[in-house]
Curated annotation (Swiss-Prot):
Classification of source organism: Eukaryota, Metazoa, Ecdysozoa, Arthropoda, Hexapoda
Source organism of this protein record: Drosophila melanogaster (Fruit fly)
GO BP terms, alphabetized: mRNA splicing, via spliceosome
Protein name per Swiss-Prot or TrEMBL: Splicing factor 3B subunit 3
Keywords: mRNA processing, mRNA splicing, Nucleus, Spliceosome
Location of this chain's protein in the cell: Nucleus
Length: 1227
């Protein structure tokens, strides 16, 4: 078996976010790390929309990310710490739209190791030095400088190691232009390590240590170290030099402390708590992330607590000595991994879980009536301030970036009967959890819909002048009339436009600088800007059947075969070319390209004929309408469209969009593509040679059951093609790649580009008798999603086969059930009433009632933390088509759903489905202790509209996995595998196997075989012998694997994903037998007594691959109608991908050679060796990396040609191969 790994949706979770001026202009950008890829975003300061400039795989794990600027520089650089054992400095090149490596210095081994630096970064605020630290012992400092050409240089590393020291965080201290200084949170564990009693460990204190880099001596010294009272989790650097007092803010549990060297004494302020909080009162409060905003005149800090509350922190100074810390509640947003305050007035919040947000900072919170807390306010030790959370007041949400992370599990199914399967994904944590239904397609925003008096057959938009920014008219053609609408604040009908309204229109367009042209069956109207009209009438009884128009040319067909060509002269008149051309067959469609800049005409006309050919005719005045080339088609052409794609005029993208070989030429022009829509629903894309007119390199895609109609529109400043069949598709070029993506919208019939003040790049389209104005904002998106909120973290789900409804198990740790929450609120309210004196009793009663009635949405304000060992669970039935919860079954406090299965019991003989739910009671995670578990059985109503509770079976272990098996229930109870049958009062235990080593986490069954996954010992192959009623292990794996997901590929083959980001496929060799009777040696009888270490037969590992993210679900499924099966996976970070099988050894050899060349020619950006990355835990075997192969599309033309030459191919052939393998299985 040979597999090819394809990423369908890149990771959406964010691990690091930094902002800066990476492109060198005045614009602010945000650089995100998504674990193993980097993504550059640019928020539009006018609209607030976030645009993705580029996304690049680094084939490594990003551990740390910082932005810095050299003193006096105009752009920011990026320094990346990864698992490569190298420090890498990157620069964004806007002209190539790529991140380029400026420096790469090796300092240690590869991999995420505790003593290899790269986990922590600290930058001197003036950009003169960087310190890079490991979790333990090692720290290195590098000095940044410029050479004579003003290029960035980096020094040799200076060591600042200290043995037996753990580092928690480090920052660069702002000391102006004094020697660079770095502050570190450290713990020295030497004494604790030597003391066997553990007393020293209890006494160990965290220290704040300052390291100074002496630029004169080129040496790092430990300048100062001080023990801390509270355990701190991170540091915030305070502006220094001329801008502020310098020093650091130490964020620790319940306290915020300011420290600095010299005469400064410590300033300490408690972290405010929410008033009347339901949280466990013993639980401390910490800050989890921060953002600093500084201008020449002021600075402030935004710090966020783990509940999501943001506080604005300011420091009061007296002669550069800090005298007071002031805190003010700012707003509440979802808890974040990183926050960035941009100079354009935006706050970017990269959420820990769920979607990421961009907010406009509307107010700084200085003038509101929110109380301000201060370190100078007198408080007893251990007391704190209280505040009341509220809805957003200072922030305004302007954009949202969808994120699926964390994906808990997923399933491919076609519950909506749409032919194309949907992906049902359980995402999120706690009250921000969602079920998301993902469909392949672009999200469409409907700007306007209006009914028309009849069913139109075509629509166009035109500008009055060529240099106008927006369109002036929408022209709608009916069977016997033409309607002209003017575009302004509203869309209204006009009658004085010069268009003929009493006839249908075949085509209309802007002509020249300021004229319009209308082609109708009886002639051509040329409407000048002063409303003069020149008409050309069709001769005799002939009528115009087809036409093609651009800015300077008009081509028409008379009565089917005769071609007439018009061209505009310098005076603006439309002149007919003297000779007409007769085609050998009836003309079905025609297309002209746009006139290139600086040219007088488009040089070629494409004509589709009824004889199943498309012909290219020259429009050169010297040999006008002479054939240049011809291409035979499998069926008649329905429509043609000539577009220039693969280059950029884009202002939004801010970078060069160029693709494969064909696009690259010295003048940075794109390639001319002829798109051919066939009557059988197939779209062909062919490259048109701009000199000879030859057609080459044809690509094919099936779009739908209807004939394909094509329309040229503008997307992000570049040309794109809208293709309409039974679904509407958009073919466009984005981030160095061609995309052909369906629109998630109903069927359209005709369309044109649309541009107005409200919608600069839209589409105007017709569907039956309605006119629609649409906008596409999320170009590059793979999936269009619909999200349905859930209450607790979803754990697993099953789909009811008869109704398609979903039964979802939701369970949260550290949470209250609704009943417990109400009881706790009532208890706190009663305490408020009883604590009040006689004169305050009425006020206390009002406050208690207000507290009980107050409902803060938990998806924003977080749910209360109940304490360790407290669980809340429920079973939800959801109609995934409409997102409607049919019913929910809440469980009592401290019952946690661990597993769930839907099955039919053969003994019940009612043909009904039953739901088995595995529950743990009073589970404590660390150490793992519980009061046992139970299996609840529910009978499912045939319409899945209710669950009937049958009975509960108590067991002494936690039921970690359940599975239906031959009309009975297989249960993994701790490390015991049991078969239960249905009983009247409880489940009846029929059979047991005690030889799984640790804990069963997954069970699959097929035929007489059971495939059982252990938490850390991979998969066991078990045979059920019905005659002896025995479960016998007959084979197992040779390697330990910490299993997260499995799926069966066939009777002998299973795919396994583990906690370290690996996928492996295990297959039983032909020699393995699962029948004990065939073994004459009698050794198999020993397994049952557990005398051998594992089974005597072993599975073979046939595929291994390191994905780099924890795979949470695996499924063998098809993603496109008529496509082949692939192994679909979803990861914790939000990635959706597929392992697709090679159908021939020849294809495998081709891609293996391409991968090998790409490793050499385009090594990973952050210095990790690609082969060692994909072999991080087990050597990569029989799996090729499609992500690396597809980078071929975006490397330089010279490298493309070199690789193609070495492989005895052309660059176009390689690009076609890459496109074909993707479209055969996925999208």
């Amino acid at each position: 078996m040979y597999l090819y790994n394809l990423t369908l949706q890149k990771a959406t979770g964010v691990t690091h976010a930094v902002h800066g001026n990476f492109s060198g202009g005045k614009q602010q950008e945000v650089l995100l790390s998504r674990g193993k890829s980097l993504e550059l975003l640019r928020p539009d300061s006018n609209t607030g929309k976030v645009h993705t400039l580029l996304s690049t795989e680094i084939f490594g794990c990003v551990r740390a990310l910082m932005a810095f600027r050299l003193t006096g520089g105009t752009k920011d650089y990026i320094v990346v710490g990864s698992d490569s054992g190298r420090i890498v400095i990157l620069e964004y090149n806007p002209s190539k739209n790529a991140l380029e490596k400026v420096h790469q210095e090796t300092f240690g081994k590869s991999g995420c190791r505790r003593i290899v630096p790269g986990q922590y970064f600290a930058i001197d605020p003036k950009g003169r030095a960087v310190m890079i630290g490991a979790v333990e012992k090692q720290k290195l400092a590098y000095i940044m400088n410029r050479d004579t050409q003003a290029r960035l240089t980096i020094s040799s590393p200076l060591e600042a190691h200290k043995s037996n020291t753990l580092t928690y965080h480090m920052v660069g201290v702002d000391v102006g232009f004094d020697n660079p200084m770095f502050a570190c949170l450290e713990i020295d564990y030497e004494e604790a390590d030597m003391d066997p009693s553990g007393d020293a460990a209890q006494r160990t204190q965290q220290t704040l240590t300052f390291y100074e880099l002496d630029l004169g001596l080129n040496h790092v010294v430990r300048k100062y170290s001080e023990p801390l009272e509270e355990h701190a989790n991170f540091l915030v650097s305070v502006p220094g030099g001329n801008d502020g007092p310098s020093g650091v803010l130490i964020c620790s549990e319940n306290y915020l402390t300011y420290k600095n060297l010299g005469d400064q004494h410590d300033i300490r302020c408690p972290i405010p708590r929410r008033r009347n909080d339901l949280d466990d009162p013993e639980r401390g409060m910490i800050f989890i992330c921060s953002a600093t905003h500084r201008t020449k005149s002021m600075y402030f800090f935004l710090l966020q607590t783990e509940q999501g509350d943001i506080f604005k922190i300011t420091l009061e100074t007296d002669d550069d000595v800090v005298s007071e810390i002031k805190l003010k509640y700012f707003d509440t947003v979802p808890p974040a991994t990183a926050m960035c305050v941009l100079k354009t007035g935006f706050l970017f919040v990269a959420s820990e879980f769920g979607n990421h947000y961009l907010y406009q900072i509307a107010h700084l919170g200085d003038d509101d009536d929110e109380p301000e807390f201060s370190s100078a306010m007198p408080l007893e030790e251990g007391e704190t301030f209280f505040f009341a959370p509220r809805a957003l007041k200072n922030l305004v949400l302007v954009d949202e970036l969808p994120s699926f992370a964390p994906i808990i599990t997923s399933q491919v199914a076609d519950l909506a009967n749409e032919d194309t399967p949907q992906l049902y994904v359980l995402c999120g944590r706690g009250p921000r959890s969602t079920l998301r239904v993902l469909r392949h397609g672009l999200e469409v925003s409907e700007m306007a819909v209006s009914e028309l008096p009849g069913n139109p057959n075509a629509v166009w938009t035109v500008k009055k002048r060529a240099d106008d920014e927006f369109d002036a008219y929408i022209i709608v053609s009916f069977v016997n009339a033409t309607l002209v609408l003017s575009i302004g604040e509203t869309v209204e009908e006009v009658t004085d436009s010069g268009f003929l309204g009493t006839t249908p229109t075949l085509c209309c367009a802007a002509l020249g600088d300021d004229a319009l042209v209308q082609v109708y069956p009886d002639g051509i109207r040329h409407i000048r800007s002063d409303k003069r009209v020149n008409e050309w009438k069709a001769p005799g009884k002939k009528s115009i059947t087809k036409c093609a128009v651009n800015q300077r040319q008009v081509v028409i067909t008379l009565s089917g075969r005769e071609l007439v060509y018009f061209e505009m002269d310098p005076t603006g008149e439309l002149n007919e070319y003297t000779e007409r051309s007769e085609m050998p067959a009836e003309i079905m469609c025609m297309a002209l390209g746009t006139v290139p800049e600086g040219e007088q005409r488009s040089w070629f006309l494409a004509v589709g004929l009824a004889d199943n050919t498309v012909r290219i005719l020259s429009l050169d005045p010297n040999n006008c309408l002479t054939p240049c080339s011809m291409q035979a088609l499998p069926s008649p052409a329905e429509s043609l469209c000539l577009v220039e794609m693969g280059h950029t005029e884009s202002t939004t993208q801010g970078g060069l969009d160029d693709d494969a070989p064909a696009q690259r030429s010295g003048n940075n022009k794109g390639t001319i593509y002829l798109n051919i829509g066939l009557s059988n629903g197939v779209l062909l894309r062919t490259v048109l040679d701009p000199v000879s007119g030859d057609l080459a390199d044809t690509r094919t895609r099936y779009l739908g059951s209807r004939p394909v109609k094509l329309f040229r529109i503008k997307m992000q400043g570049s040309e794109a093609v809208l293709a309409m069949s039974s679904r509407t598709w958009l073919s466009y070029y984005h981030q160095n790649r061609f995309h052909l993506t369906p629109l998630s919208y109903e069927t359209l019939e005709y369309a044109s580009g649309f541009s107005s003040e409200q919608c600069s790049e839209g589409i105007v389209a017709i569907s039956t008798n309605t006119l629609r104005i649409l906008a596409l904002e999320k170009l590059g998106a793979v999936f269009n999603q619909v999200a349905f909120p859930l209450q607790y973290t979803p754990r697993t789900f099953v789909i009811h086969p008869d109704t398609g409804r979903m039964l979802i198990a939701e369970t949260d740790h550290n949470a209250y059930t609704e009943d417990t929450k109400s009881a706790r609120k009532e208890q706190m309210a009663e305490e408020m009433r009883s604590a009040a004196g006689d004169e305050e009793r009425e006020l206390a009663r009002e406050m208690a009632n207000a507290f009980i009635n107050e409902v803060l949405p938990e998806d924003v304000f977080s749910s209360p933390k109940a304490g360790l060992g407290l669980w809340a669970s429920q079973i939800r039935c959801l109609d995934a088509m409409h997102g409607q919860t049919m019913f929910s079954v809440p469980l009592t406090q401290n019952e946690a759903i661990m597993s769930m299965a839907m099955l039919k019991f053969s003994i019940a003989a009612d043909g009904r489905y039953y739901l088995a739910v595995g529950i743990a009671k009073d589970l404590q995670l660390n150490p793992r202790i519980s009061q046992g578990g139970c299996i609840d059985i529910y009978k499912i109503d045939p319409t899945c509209s209710s669950l009937e509770f049958m009975h509960r079976t108590d067991i002494d272990e936690i039921p970690g996995a359940l599975c239906g098996f031959q009309g009975r229930l297989l249960a993994g109870c701790g490390r015991m595998l049991r078969i239960y049958d249905f009983g009247k009062k409880k489940m009846l235990r029929k059979c047991e196997n005690k030889h799984i080593p640790y804990q069963i986490v997954n069970i699959q069954a097929m035929g007489h075989r059971v495939y059982v996954s252990d938490v850390q010992e991979s998969v066991f192959f078990i045979r059920y012998r019905r005659a002896e009623n025995q479960l016998i292990i007959f084979a197992d794996d040779t390697h330990p694997r910490w299993v997260t997901a499995t799926t069966l590929l066939d009777y002998d083959t299973i795919a396994i994903a583990d906690k370290f980001g690996n996928l492996s496929i295990q297959r039983l060799p032909h020699s393995v037998t699962d029948d004990v009777d065939e073994d004459p040696t009698g050794t198999k009888s020993l397994w049952d007594r557990g005398l051998l270490s594992g089974a005597s037969q072993k599975s073979e590992n046939i595929c291994s691959f390191h994905v780099g993210e924890i795979i949470m679900s695996l499924q063998k499924a098809t993603l496109i109608p008529g496509g082949s099966e692939a192994l679909i996976y979803a990861t914790l970070s939000g990635t959706v991908g597929a392992f697709v099988p090679f159908t021939s050894r020849e294809d495998y050899d081709f891609f293996q050679h391409l991968e090998m060349h790409m490793r050499n020619e385009n090594p990973p950006l952050c210095g990790r060796d690609h082969l060692s990355y994909r072999s991080s835990y087990y050597p990569v075997k029989n799996v090729l990396d499609g992500d690396l192969c597809e980078q071929y599309l975006s490397i330089e033309a010279a490298k493309q040609k070199s690789i193609a030459g070495d492989m005895f191919r052309t660059p176009n052939q390689i690009c076609k191969k890459l496109e074909d393998i993707r479209t055969r299985y996925a999208f």
